[in-house]
A protein has these predicted regions:
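HEAT-repeat alpha-solenoid elements in large eukaryotic scaffold proteins
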Residues: 12-23, 54-75
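Boundary/linker segments of alpha-helical solenoid repeat arrays
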Residues: 167-173, 185-187
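Amphipathic alpha-helical scaffolding segments comprising HEAT/armadillo-like alpha-solenoid repeats
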Residues: 4-7, 33-47, 69-99, 118-130, ...
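Intrinsically disordered, serine/threonine- and proline-rich low-complexity regions
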Residues: 1-25, 29
Length: 193
């Protein structure tokens, strides 16, 4: 049994050489043809270094799908490899919530956190929902907390009732109503068919 030896994608980020734009020309289909470990490494590089938000968005979608496959155990990787890759994806999603400037990309990562029920990132979603410069990001972070039935952060979500943007306030109102209705329910993540 081999163990995944994957360099820490979050150390020495500033030391990465500037990569050729052709490198970032990888499409979703090309990335999907790579073995899972290599695919994750490439997606991390794209998310951290591409100036094309559509490429970062694609990579987030693929990371979410990969997380889902790893979580289900429907793969040929060892448990150690699978756990390590899931940890890298969670760390990457947390990094995106803190660093992404594009609202559409931020929206997408919030969705994938909720769809995969990555509860360790609830505090990061709260921060995004209350503090992000992106209206779209604040909206989706709050909506994602509602989808995840994050009862434990209702007080923090209430802060968004004072958001200067009507759509964000409406999202907070909606989510708080939903959380009250689902108080005794458990969220298990979206089922991907």
């Amino acid at each position: 049994m081999s163990t995944l030896v994957m360099p820490d994608p979050f150390s020495g980020i500033e030391s990465f050489p500037l990569l050729e734009m052709d490198y970032f020309g990888l499409t979703e289909n090309q990335l999907n043809k790579l073995p899972p470990k290599q695919r994750l490494e490439e997606m991390i590089k794209i998310i951290k270094h591409s100036d094309d938000e559509s490429q970062r968005w694609d990579s987030i979608c693929l990371c979410g799908e990969l997380y889902h496959v790893l979580d289900r155990g429907d793969h040929d990787l060892s448990n150690v490899d699978s756990l390590q890759m899931k940890t890298h994806i969670k760390d990457l999603f947390r990094w995106i919530l803190k660093n992404e400037k594009n609202g559409v990309v931020l929206h997408e990562v919030c969705y994938h956190i909720a769809a995969r029920n990555i509860r360790e990132l609830i505090p990061d979603l709260v921060t995004c929902g209350v503090c992000s410069d992106s209206i779209l990001g604040r909206h989706e972070a709050i909506e994602s907390l509602g989808l995840m039935n994050a009862q434990e952060v209702m007080d923090e979500i209430r802060k968004a009732l004072d958001d200067p943007v009507r759509d964000v306030r409406e999202t907070a109102e909606f989510v708080l109503k939903r959380l009250r209705r689902y108080k005794n329910e458990t969220y298990e993540g979206l089922q991907i068919i």
